[in-house]
Amino acid sequence: MDLRTFIRDIPDFPEKGIIFRDITPLLKDKEAFKHAIDMLAEKLSEIDFDLIVAPEARGFIFGGALSYKLNKGFIPVRKPGKLPYEVISEKYTLEYGEAELQMHVDSINKGQKVIIFDDVLATGGTAKALKKLVEKAGGEVVAMSFLIELSYLNPRDILKDENIISLIIL
């Protein structure tokens, strides 16, 4: 199944000059969604790890499903003000602005092995910030996984030493 056919391009969203990769057609199609989860789980099952860390919102969809399928813990990473307990934070630059990520201070035990999952790898800024957040908490990032990688933005340039696993490369 060619999952690329389920990715819709939305020009000038959220800002002019940005092409948004809309995964809702993939999510809507039960066979495509299942295929994506199964393929990602197959790739990740070969790695020794304890937790999947994923940012809101679309990272939750895949990160939660993968955690369930692989019998691993799931750590949600949110925007400021969304978590009820004490947090650690990391600020970073996006393709179209600045942002901040937070997770509970006790989310990761020292030495736990983590896979970071997000729906799209664009510039690598979010992934880099997620890694810093995991390391602040005492975790070790053993891989970064993505549904879609936008190779034309050269995200691997800033993630040179990372084990990157992408399902769809555009």
From Swiss-Prot:
| Superkingdom of source | Bacteria
Q: What class of enzyme is it?
A: transferase
Entry EC no(s): 2.4.2.7
Q: In which pathway does it act?
A: Purine metabolism; AMP biosynthesis via salvage pathway; AMP from adenine: step 1/1
Q: Name one GO biological process term.
A: adenine salvage
Instruction: List GO terms (cellular component aspect).
Output: cytoplasm
User: What biological function has been recorded for the protein in this entry?
Assistant: Catalyzes a salvage reaction resulting in the formation of AMP, that is energically less costly than de novo synthesis.
Quaternary structure note = Homodimer.
Question: Which protein family is it in?
Answer: Belongs to the purine/pyrimidine phosphoribosyltransferase family.
Listed name of the protein: Adenine phosphoribosyltransferase
Q: Which organism is it from?
A: Thermosipho africanus (strain TCF52B)
Q: Which gene encodes it?
A: apt
